[in-house]
UniProtKB/Swiss-Prot annotation:
Gene name as annotated: PTS
GO molecular function: 6-pyruvoyltetrahydropterin synthase activity; identical protein binding; metal ion binding
PROSITE patterns xref list: PTPS_2 (PS00988)
Identification of the protein by name: 6-pyruvoyl tetrahydrobiopterin synthase
GO biological process, one term: tetrahydrobiopterin biosynthetic process
Co-factor note (free text): Binds 1 zinc ion per subunit.
Pfam families: PTPS
Top-level lineage group: Eukaryota
């Protein structure tokens, strides 16, 4: 049997991307309506607005000499479906996701939510990075720090 890297212990990062659609309103209950409007602008519209988010999840670890993989991408897809798609896709984040009842649904906080959910389903220690695209120009990277 051949091993990864000719017998060396090789580390690698593996990423998978998915997309989900969700609506939300940027609004802090600690601020007045006027302050929210000043801070969040049109994103504080009382009727909300939506995004087609893209998420890139990166895991890391040693390349298994028997399989040649850090993680089977089919398994990563299942974990992402459970941790991201089921709770977030086609949802109003503020109304349908209990986490956001007390947390402003900024892209930063959505990335933290995704990280926390993935940590619950992935093997311990493999999650490396969550990269969340709210738009092509607005991107948040979260590494659990």
């Amino acid at each position: 049997m051949s091993t990864a890297g000719g017998g060396r212990r090789c580390q690698a990062q593996v990423s998978r991307r998915i997309s989900f659609s969700a609506s939300h309103r940027l609004y802090s209950k600690f601020l007045s309506d006027e302050e929210n409007l000043k801070l969040f602008g049109k994103c504080s519209n009382p009727n909300g607005h939506g995004h087609n988010y893209k998420v890139v999840v990166t895991v890391h670890g040693e390349i298994d000499p028997a399989t040649g993989m850090v993680m089977n991408l089919a398994d990563l897809k299942k974990y992402m479906e459970e941790a991201i798609m089921q709770p977030l896709d086609h949802k109003n984040l503020d109304m349908d996701v209990p986490y956001f009842a007390d947390v402003v649904s900024t892209t930063e906080n959505v990335a933290v939510y995704i990280w926390d959910n993935l940590q619950k389903v992935l093997p311990v220690g493999v999650l490396y990075k969550v990269k969340l695209y709210e738009t092509d120009n607005n991107i948040v990277v979260y590494k659990g720090e």
